[in-house]
């Protein structure tokens, strides 16, 4: 259903508010450079510090601007199942083509709790849903066996696997077969994950290098393995630089250095440390981005 290079797009701010004009420009930048789908209100979009009105508005703007040219997959996850259902339902009403739901964080549900949470959302909202497993941020790991149970649900179509573990990704692909699509949640591991059967990436790096991330994925699916491998190696340094501090601080700084929006992030996120900014600038210059 979804495939290729999918960007987890940043949410630009200006004087504390969502910068709607810059958000529209960022959407155009992505589509013009070959991005296959757009995820607003993910981790990279600072969903955790958007209020409900802003969250809905960001999704609405992206849907409006995209005009059905590529799928829009709205971030609608929550650690409250009731809230996740409401947000996913509203995303559908706004015209989103799918939803990305992070595992419930902080309250640390069991595997059965995770299963029941996702099943409840999928039962309640007839919209294609992507599970999102990122234990480094949530404190809970959605195990392959649980993913396999959820893959039986018609509305659960994919998983963004961001453990950084090829073993876990491979186990999901092996257990689920064609019942669910797997996407890399870490740019540095996209190529090897696709070699194991992943269908693409939900990317941070694509915020600044959409054409190149798309080239990696497109080369792989065109059977041009050596070209894809070379793109993987070429993008490795810049992809790692996106995590010199907590995402999305480095990538938003990078987008700002390219003149595309402000570097403003919301507390408790802080601006990129000056020493890390110096490193980031040097790496971006190597890539000809600034």
Swiss-Prot record:
Gene Ontology annotations for the cellular component aspect, listed alphabetically: cytosol
Q: Which family does it belong to?
A: Belongs to the DapA family.
Q: Which domain of life is it from?
A: Bacteria
What protein name applies here?
A: 4-hydroxy-tetrahydrodipicolinate synthase
One Pfam short name: DHDPS
Query: Which Cys pairs does UniProt list as disulfide-bonded?
Result: none
Instruction: State the oligomer form and interacting partners.
Output: Homotetramer; dimer of dimers.
Q: Which InterPro entries match?
A: Aldolase_TIM, DapA, DapA-like, Schiff_base-form_aldolases_AS, Schiff_base-form_aldolases_CS
Role according to the record: Catalyzes the condensation of (S)-aspartate-beta-semialdehyde [(S)-ASA] and pyruvate to 4-hydroxy-tetrahydrodipicolinate (HTPA).
Show the GO MF annotations.
4-hydroxy-tetrahydrodipicolinate synthase activity
Assign the protein's first listed, main location to one coarse class: cytoplasm
Gene designation? dapA
Q: In which pathway does it act?
A: Amino-acid biosynthesis; L-lysine biosynthesis via DAP pathway; (S)-tetrahydrodipicolinate from L-aspartate: step 3/4
User: Which HAMAP family is this protein grouped with?
Assistant: DapA
Q: Where does pyruvate bind?
A: 44, 202
Q: Where is the active site?
A: 132 (proton donor/acceptor), 160 (schiff-base intermediate with substrate)
Localization in the cell: Cytoplasm
This chain's source organism reads: Geotalea uraniireducens (strain Rf4)
What keywords are annotated for this sequence in UniProt? Amino-acid biosynthesis, Cytoplasm, Diaminopimelate biosynthesis, Lyase, Lysine biosynthesis, Schiff base
Q: What is the lineage of its organism?
A: Bacteria, Pseudomonadati, Thermodesulfobacteriota, Desulfuromonadia, Geobacterales
Query: Reaction catalysed by this chain?
Result: L-aspartate 4-semialdehyde + pyruvate = (2S,4S)-4-hydroxy-2,3,4,5-tetrahydrodipicolinate + H2O + H(+)
Indicate whether Amino-acid biosynthesis appears among the record's keywords: yes
| EC number from the UniProt entry | 4.3.3.7
GO biological processes: diaminopimelate biosynthetic process; lysine biosynthetic process via diaminopimelate
């Amino acid at each position: 259903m979804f495939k290729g290079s999918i960007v987890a797009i940043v949410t630009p701010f200006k004087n504390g508010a969502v910068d709607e004009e810059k958000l529209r420009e960022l959407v155009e930048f992505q589509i013009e450079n070959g991005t296959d789908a757009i995820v607003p209100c993910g981790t990279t979009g600072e969903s955790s510090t958007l209020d409900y009105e802003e969250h809905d508005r960001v999704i609405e703007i992206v849907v409006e601007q995209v005009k059905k040219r590529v799928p829009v997959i709205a971030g609608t996850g929550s650690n409250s199942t009731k809230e996740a259902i409401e947000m996913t339902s509203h995303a559908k009403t706004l015209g989103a083509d799918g939803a990305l739901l992070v595992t419930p964080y902080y309250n640390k549900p069991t595997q059965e709790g995770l299963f029941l949470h996702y099943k409840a959302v999928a039962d309640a909202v007839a919209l294609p849903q992507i599970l999102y497993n990122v234990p480094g941020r949530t404190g809970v790991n959605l195990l392959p066996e649980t993913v396999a149970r959820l893959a039986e649900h018609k509305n659960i179509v994919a998983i963004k696997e961001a453990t950084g573990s090829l073993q876990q990704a491979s186990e999901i692909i092996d257990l689920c077969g064609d019942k669910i699509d797997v996407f890399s949640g870490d740019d540095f591991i996209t190529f090897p994950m696709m070699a194991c059967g992943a269908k693409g990436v939900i990317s941070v790096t694509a915020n600044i290098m959409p054409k190149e991330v798309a080239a990696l994925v497109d080369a792989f699916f065109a059977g041009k393995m050596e070209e894809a491998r070379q793109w993987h190696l070429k993008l490795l340094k810049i992809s790692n630089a996106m995590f010199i501090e907590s995402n999305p601080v480095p990538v938003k700084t990078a987008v700002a250095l390219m003149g595309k929006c402000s570097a403003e992030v919301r507390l408790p996120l802080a601006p990129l440390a000056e020493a890390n900014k110096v490193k980031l600038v040097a790496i971006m210059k190597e890539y000809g981005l600034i």
